[in-house]
Amino acid sequence: MHNPRWKAGGRAFAHIAQFHPELTALRRDLHAHPELGFEELYTGRRVKEALQLCGVDEIHEGIGRTGLVAVVRGRSQSSGSMVGLRADMDALPIAEHNDFSWKSCKQGLMHGCGHDGHTAML
């Protein structure tokens, strides 16, 4: 059964949709500035800025050199349950041949498998 809150016209969808411009801008910025694994310094800074704007409770940096972990505390601490979400941030050593305003500004590097999108959405 489908919950009406999750339909394209539902409340949850409308709430998430209000962030579309910011998420699109972040994804395009990450796409334009690709970095190989363990070199994601710019990406890490941008992700940290976005997490701070979201008001996460804690941000731990330097995980696996360039990774981050954000802690969001739920309203109820009684269950002890936790959920972990993750996204890769690295790009690939591939030349980008797309021609749009947010194409890679780094010769021979691009986000070719969606890590920019995964990072922005998470």
Regions found by a protein language model. Name each.
Residues 2-111, 120:
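Acidic/His- and Gly-rich active-site-bordering loop/insert found
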